[in-house]
C-alpha cells in the first residue's frame, strides 16, 4: 500500500519536474523567435528607410504605388533624382567636372551628394526605344526640334503615363481597340506598321487581307509609334517583325514620378489634347535658354518647386513595364 503511494507521489513529482523543463524550453524557444523576429524587423526597417541608389530592378507590369508628396519633411534624405539629358548638353559644356559642380549646387537645395544621378542619352528617337526611369523622381530634358515634334510628343505620352500591355500575335489573331485608352505601342530600331480594317465577314475594308501592299500604313520607319485606329473594328496587322515589337496597351493614368522639361521652342508641347489624358494636366515645363549651363542652373533653382507637383513611386520602370502584364 505504501509502495503504491510512494510510486504515485514519485510519478507526480517527476511529472512536475518534466512539465517545468518543457515550459522553460518552450519559453526559451519563444524568446529566440521573438528576438530574432525583432532583429529582422529592425534590419528591414533600416533598409527600407535607407537611400535608394537607383538599382536596375527587373520590374514588369504597372505596379506603382503612390507615396506621400514631396512636401513631406525630409523627403530628399530618402529619395533619388535622375536627370536625363541629351549628349548635346555635355558636348557644349565640355567640362569633365560639370556633374560634380551641379551636385554641389543641388546640395544647397537639400539634395545630398549621391542622391542626384545624371544620365545621358544620344537623342530623343533612340531614348524612346528603351526608356529606363529608375529613380524616385525622374526629370527628362528634351531639346525642342521642329522636325522631331511628333516624336517628342509620343515619348512624352509614353513616359508621363502608366501603360498596361500584352504581347500581340498577329499571325493567329485579328485585333481591335476597345476604347480611347486602348492603343498599340510599337518599339524597335525601325517600325513600319500597316493595318487592314475588316468588316463582319472578315473581308478587308478598302484593302485586301492577302495583299499587304494594300494595307493602310500608320507608322513608317519609326522607333516609337503609338497607333490609334477606329474602336470596335477588327484589324489585320502587319509590321516589321525583325526590327520591331508591338503590344496591345491600355493607358491607366498619369505616372507622377516623371516630368518633362522642354528646352526651347515657342510653346510647350501639349499632350492634354489627347482625350485619353485624364485628368487634363501634365508635368511638362519649358525653359528657353541657348546655353545648357543656363538650363541646368534654372533646373537647380526650381528643382523643389518641380518636385512638389510630382509624387514619389515605389517601383523602378523600364521598357519591360510597357510590355508584359503581371
Curated annotation (Swiss-Prot):
Posttranslational modification: N-glycosylated. The N-terminus is blocked possibly by pyroglutamic acid.
Residues that coordinate or bind Ca(2+) 1: 95, 206, 214, 216
GO molecular function: metal ion binding
Keyword Calcium assigned: yes
InterPro entries: VP7, VP7_1, VP7_2
Cystine crosslinks: 82-135, 165-249, 191-244, 196-207
Region (GPR motif), start-end ranges: 253-255
Source superkingdom: Viruses
Annotated keywords: Calcium, Capsid protein, Disulfide bond, Glycoprotein, Host endoplasmic reticulum, Host-virus interaction, Metal-binding, Outer capsid protein, Signal, T=13 icosahedral capsid protein, Virion
Signal peptide: 1-50
Residues glycosylated per entry: 69, 238
GO cellular component: host cell endoplasmic reticulum lumen; T=13 icosahedral viral capsid; viral outer capsid
Subcellular location: Virion; Host endoplasmic reticulum lumen
Listed transmembrane segments: none
Statement: the UniProt record of this protein carries the keyword Transmembrane helix: no
Positions bound to Ca(2+) 2: 177, 228-229, 231, 301
Chain positions covered by the region annotation CNP motif: 165-167
Assembly, per entry: Homotrimer; disulfide-linked. 2 Ca(2+) ions bound at each subunit interface in the trimer hold the trimer together. Interacts with the intermediate capsid protein VP6. Interacts with the outer capsid protein VP5*.
Biological role stated in the UniProt entry: Calcium-binding protein that interacts with rotavirus cell receptors once the initial attachment by VP4 has been achieved. Rotavirus attachment and entry into the host cell probably involves multiple sequential contacts between the outer capsid proteins VP4 and VP7, and the cell receptors. Following entry into the host cell, low intracellular or intravesicular Ca(2+) concentration probably causes the calcium-stabilized VP7 trimers to dissociate from the virion. This step is probably necessary for the membrane-disrupting entry step and the release of VP4, which is locked onto the virion by VP7.
Family (UniProt): Belongs to the rotavirus VP7 family.
Miscellaneous notes: Some rotavirus strains are neuraminidase-sensitive and require sialic acid to attach to the cell surface. Some rotavirus strains are integrin-dependent. Some rotavirus strains depend on ganglioside for their entry into the host cell. Hsp70 also seems to be involved in the entry of some strains.
Protein known as: Outer capsid glycoprotein VP7
UniProt organism field: Rotavirus A (isolate RVA/Human/Australia/A91a/1991/G1P[X]) (RV-A)
Amino acid at each position: 500500500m505504501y509502495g503504491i503511494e510512494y510510486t504515485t507521489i514519485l510519478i507526480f513529482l517527476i511529472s512536475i519536474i518534466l512539465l517545468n523543463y518543457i515550459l522553460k524550453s518552450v519559453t526559451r524557444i519563444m524568446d529566440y523567435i521573438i528576438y530574432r523576429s525583432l532583429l529582422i524587423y529592425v534590419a528591414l526597417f533600416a533598409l527600407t528607410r535607407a537611400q535608394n541608389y537607383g538599382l536596375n530592378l527587373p520590374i514588369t507590369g504597372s505596379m506603382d504605388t503612390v507615396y506621400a508628396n514631396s512636401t513631406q519633411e525630409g523627403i530628399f534624405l530618402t529619395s533619388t533624382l535622375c536627370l536625363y539629358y541629351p549628349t548635346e548638353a555635355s558636348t557644349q559644356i565640355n567640362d569633365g567636372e560639370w556633374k560634380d559642380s551641379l551636385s554641389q549646387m543641388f546640395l544647397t537645395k537639400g539634395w545630398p551628394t549621391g542622391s542626384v544621378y545624371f544620365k545621358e542619352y544620344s537623342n530623343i528617337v533612340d531614348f524612346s526605344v528603351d526608356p529606363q526611369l529608375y529613380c524616385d523622381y525622374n526629370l527628362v530634358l528634351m531639346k525642342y526640334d521642329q522636325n522631331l515634334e511628333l516624336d517628342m510628343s509620343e515619348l512624352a505620352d509614353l513616359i508621363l503615363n502608366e501603360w498596361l500591355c500584352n504581347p500581340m500575335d498577329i499571325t493567329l489573331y485579328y485585333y481591335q481597340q476597345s476604347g480611347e485608352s486602348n492603343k498599340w505601342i510599337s518599339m524597335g530600331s525601325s517600325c513600319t506598321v500597316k493595318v487592314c480594317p475588316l468588316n463582319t465577314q472578315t473581308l478587308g475594308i478598302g484593302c485586301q487581307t492577302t495583299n499587304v501592299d494594300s494595307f493602310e500604313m500608320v507608322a513608317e520607319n519609326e522607333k516609337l509609334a503609338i497607333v490609334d485606329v477606329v474602336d470596335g473594328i477588327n484589324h489585320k496587322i502587319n509590321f516589321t517583325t525583325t526590327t520591331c515589337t508591338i503590344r496591345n496597351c491600355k493607358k491607366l493614368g498619369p505616372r507622377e514620378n516623371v516630368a518633362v522639361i522642354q528646352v526651347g521652342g515657342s510653346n510647350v508641347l501639349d499632350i492634354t489634347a489627347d482625350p485619353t489624358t485624364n485628368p487634363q494636366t501634365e508635368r511638362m515645363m519649358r525653359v528657353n535658354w541657348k546655353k545648357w549651363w543656363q538650363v541646368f542652373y534654372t533646373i537647380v533653382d526650381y528643382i523643389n518647386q518641380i518636385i512638389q507637383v510630382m509624387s514619389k513611386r515605389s517601383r523602378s520602370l523600364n521598357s519591360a513595364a510597357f510590355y508584359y502584364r503581371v
